[in-house]
Every structure is written in structure tokens, then in C-alpha cells.
Amino acid sequence: MAFRRLKQVLRKRKLNHSGVTVDQQVNCVAYGARSGIWTICPDMLSSKSVIYSFGVGNNIAWDLAMIEHYGVELHAFDPTPRSVDWIGEQSVPQEFHFHPVGLCGFDGL
């Protein structure tokens, strides 16, 4: 815990030296596992929220945490065959919707 606080202080000091200041503090919570840990501001999330998650790969810990903690409807996207196969083997809640498509700068293949 002390290490995390030290990192925050050093990060804030570095930003201040660059001329960046914090105008407002927000409530932050981190969820996920391995390389998929993401920080969110949960204040406006509810069971009526819809989340779109892109490039899920084989790590849906963050996605499942959003459903578990906030009851959101979550749409996960990843076109890679490995991810499609892996997701197909998982037991996911009904609020989790997987789409085997991705984002690109153009339409088509």
C-alpha cells in the first residue's frame, strides 16, 4: 500500500513539473487480472449501463468484474480465432455478449 501511495505522489510531482495539474479528484477502482487490469470511475455505473469491451483475447476478468459488481450488460469484441475458440469454452453470465468482430480503420477484410 505504501508503494502505491509513493507512486501516486511521484506521478503527481512529475505532472506538476510538466505544467499539468489535477483539477478534480474522482473515485477510482481497478478491476481485472494479468495484463487486463483497468481503472474506472464507478460513480455513474448501474445495472442499466452498457459496456463495450474490445480486444478481449483470453482474459475476461475485467469484463466479468463489471458484470458482477455493477450488473451491467457487456458486449465483448475480438475477431481472432484463438479468442473466439477460447470464449466458446467459457461459462459466462447472460449479461456477457461476445461478438467475433473487431475495429479497423476501414470496412471489409
Locations of the language-model features?
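Phosphate/nucleotide-binding beta-alpha loop and adjacent structural elements of enzyme active sites
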Residues: M1-L109
